Amino acid sequence: MTQLSSNDVPSMGRRQFMNLLTFGTATGVALGALYPVANYFMPLRAGGGGGGTSAKDELGNPVTKTGWLANHQAGDRSLVQGLKGDPTYLIVNSEGDIGEFGLNAICTHLGCVVPWDSGANKFICPCHGSQYDTNGKVVRGPAPLSLALAHVDVDDDAVLVKQWSETDFRTNENPWWA
C-alpha cells in the first residue's frame, strides 16, 4: 500500500479551524434551544403501560386510587394536574369510585380556571360568569363550548389521565379539543 507524504495531506489552517469551531458551537446552541421546543410538542409520557399521564396532586405527587378515595366522598370534584399539566377535575361518582372521565378546568371563554361550586352543584367561572353542569356541559355563556373531557383510568392503583378523542357524550358531536 502506498503511503501519502506529509505534503499530499491537506492541513487545516487557522481560518478553517476557527470556522469549524464557530459552526460547531452554533450547532450545539441551536440543538440545545430546540430540545425544549421538541419536548413541548412531543412530551414524555408518565404513567403505566396504557400510555396515560399520571395524575398529580397539588404537590406534584402521583395520585393513587386508594389515597384519593380515602379523602374524597361521592359527588366530589377535585383538581389534579392532568394532561399537559392542565388542571383537571377528578370526579368521585355516586358509587364512591373514581369516574371514568375527568374535566379540564380551563374555561372555554378566556382560559380562567373554573371552580366547582358544590352549593350550586355546578362549575361557575369567576371571570365572566360562565356556568357548566356536573358533567362540564356549558349551560350559560359567554363560554362557547363545554369543558374538555379526558379519560380517567386506574392501573395498579395509579390514576392515569388520557386524551379523549371519541364522541362527546354530552353533545353527541366530535370533541372540539381533539
From Swiss-Prot:
Its cofactor is [2Fe-2S] cluster. Keywords: 2Fe-2S, Disulfide bond, Electron transport, Iron, Iron-sulfur, Membrane, Metal-binding, Thylakoid, Translocase, Transmembrane, Transmembrane helix, Transport. Its EC number is 7.1.1.6. Disulfide bonds join C112-C127. One of its GO terms (biological process) is photosynthesis. PANTHER family: CYTOCHROME B-C1 COMPLEX SUBUNIT RIESKE, MITOCHONDRIAL. The keyword Iron-sulfur applies. Component of the cytochrome b6-f complex, which mediates electron transfer between photosystem II (PSII) and photosystem I (PSI), cyclic electron flow around PSI, and state transitions. This is Cytochrome b6-f complex iron-sulfur subunit. It is found in: Cellular thylakoid membrane. It comes from Prochlorococcus marinus (strain MIT 9515). Binds 1 [2Fe-2S] cluster per subunit. Pfam families: Rieske, TM_PetC. It comes from the Bacteria.
